[in-house]
């Protein structure tokens, strides 16, 4: 649970900004996106392999 403490006289916009910053730092949104778009491990490995081949070809062509 994310807790944002407010100081006396602090406005709501500043508190929301603090909350958003803490929310991003915890990585909750990334975890939710990752869980919603589940990718099978075999597909993940295949995509990583394809990306590695592409990156290697790209780096070799730059020489």
Swiss-Prot record:
Domain of life: Bacteria
GO MF annotation: an example: structural constituent of ribosome
One annotated GO biological process: translation
GO cellular component: ribonucleoprotein complex; ribosome
Transmembrane parts of this sequence: none
Entry keyword annotation includes Ribosomal protein: yes
Keyword Lyase: no
InterPro entries: Ribosomal_bS21, Ribosomal_bS21_sf
Family, as annotated: Belongs to the bacterial ribosomal protein bS21 family.
Protein name: Small ribosomal subunit protein bS21
Species name: Azobacteroides pseudotrichonymphae genomovar. CFP2
């Amino acid at each position: 649970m994310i807790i944002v403490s407010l100081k006396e006289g602090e406005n709501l916009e500043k508190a929301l900004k603090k909350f958003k910053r803490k929310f991003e730092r915890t990585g909750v949104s990334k975890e939710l996106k990752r869980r919603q778009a589940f990718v099978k491990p075999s597909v993940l490995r295949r995509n990583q392999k394809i990306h590695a081949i592409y990156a290697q070809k790209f780096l070799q062509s730059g020489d």
